UniProtKB/Swiss-Prot annotation:
Top-level taxon: Bacteria
InterPro entries, per the entry: Aldolase_TIM, BATS_dom, Biotin_synth/BioAB, Biotin_synthase, Elp3/MiaA/NifB-like_rSAM, rSAM
The protein, known as: Biotin synthase
Needed cofactors: [4Fe-4S] cluster; [2Fe-2S] cluster
Gene name of the record: bioB
Pathway entry: Cofactor biosynthesis; biotin biosynthesis; biotin from 7,8-diaminononanoate: step 2/2
Length: 326
């Protein structure tokens, strides 16, 4: 097996489908060896995530409890005040997180909220943590302002393939997502972008989603892979759970396509066994969301995470990507 990996932005769909069809042991061995070329194989990034504005989103994403289009048990909440955000940042740091992400249930970032967002970025940077914002669609001018405030990453997931996208939402289109990703890139902010498995997509849709990400001008520095958490009241509440092996294979393919990216286990990890998480980490995942709540869905218990990482001999990393693409 050739273990020398070249960074590419010219992947073809048939190549990625071939990876998905590779026998499991061969695939995760290749992805593991790829991972070792670019990362400490026994190191992981812990990312905390805070919802600064909950519910009432005008988008109709069919998986989301925060959409105003569906009747879920979620209670709508206004923007958090800065003091509560400051406490959350300090709590995350004290718990061992080296990256702090914050999100708002908005269609797009509004100019009137820029100062408020920049204040949050300053609070995160004052604690010497990596910062990541997920605030919806963003213009180039807005992205430049967040870059100047010190933002390290901007999250903007593409969710699935272009072909399947209209089955997920109809209030925006795929090109809207890609335009925002380009604005983030042009502003010099590191891109965080991934997808969700379990929306009803095919293996080919997963391959096409990863193809889009891997063939961007520059690979996202962070790629969150979510497993759908079905929410009662949403159109996807009865979706079939993604097969565990299929999920692990997607992690492996992601690592092979984007060798230098942080591959993050995101939503749905609470229902994964220790053995499944261990295989995901072996296959190339090297970041997890840390904390007992992930936006509006439950996450793994912090003590359980610490225990698992200890058993695996995995240590946490120090923040290094401070407002830089290098």
């Amino acid at each position: 097996m050739n273990t020398c990996t070249t960074i590419r932005n010219n992947w073809q769909l048939d190549e990625i489908l071939e990876l998905f069809n590779t026998p499991f042991n061969d695939l995760i061995l290749r992805s593991h060896l790829t991972h070792r070329q670019f990362f400490n194989n026994n190191e992981i990034q812990l990312a905390a995530l805070l919802n600064i504005k909950t519910g009432g989103c005008p988008e109709n994403c069919r998986y989301c409890s925060q959409s105003a289009h569906y009747k879920t048990d979620l209670q709508k909440e206004a923007l958090l005040d800065v003091e509560n955000i400051k406490k959350a940042i300090q709590t995350a740091k004290n718990s061992g997180a080296d990256r702090f992400c914050f999100a708002a249930a908005w269609r797009q970032l509004r100019d009137k909220d820029i100062e408020y967002i920049c204040n949050i970025i300053n609070l995160i940077k004052s604690e010497k943590l990596e910062s990541c914002a997920s605030l919806g669609m963003i213009t180039l001018d807005q992205a430049k302002k967040l870059k100047n405030a010190g933002l390290d990453f901007y999250n903007h997931n593409i969710d699935t393939s272009r072909d399947f996208y209209s089955n997920v939402t109809t209030t925006r289109n795929y090109d809207d997502r890609l335009a925002s990703l380009n604005n983030i890139y042009e502003a010099g902010i590191n891109i965080c972008s991934g997808g969700i498995l379990g929306l009803g997509e095919s293996i080919e849709d997963r391959a096409k989603m990863l193809l889009t990400l891997a063939n961007l001008k520059e690979h996202p520095r962070s790629v969150p892979i979510n497993r759908l958490v079905p929410i009662k009241g949403t159109p996807f509440e009865n979706n079939i759970k993604v097969d565990n092996i299929d999920f692990i294979k997607t992690i492996a393919v992601t690592r092979i396509l984007m060798p230098k990216s942080y591959v993050r286990l995101a939503a749905g990890r609470k229902d994964m066994s220790e053995e499944m998480q261990a295989l995901c980490l072996f296959a190339g995942a090297n970041s997890i969301f840390y904390g007992e709540k992930l936006l509006t869905t439950p996450n793994s218990n912090c003590d359980d995470d610490k225990n698992l990482l200890s058993k695996l001999g995995i240590k946490t990393k120090e923040p290094v990507l401070l407002n830089s693409q290098n």
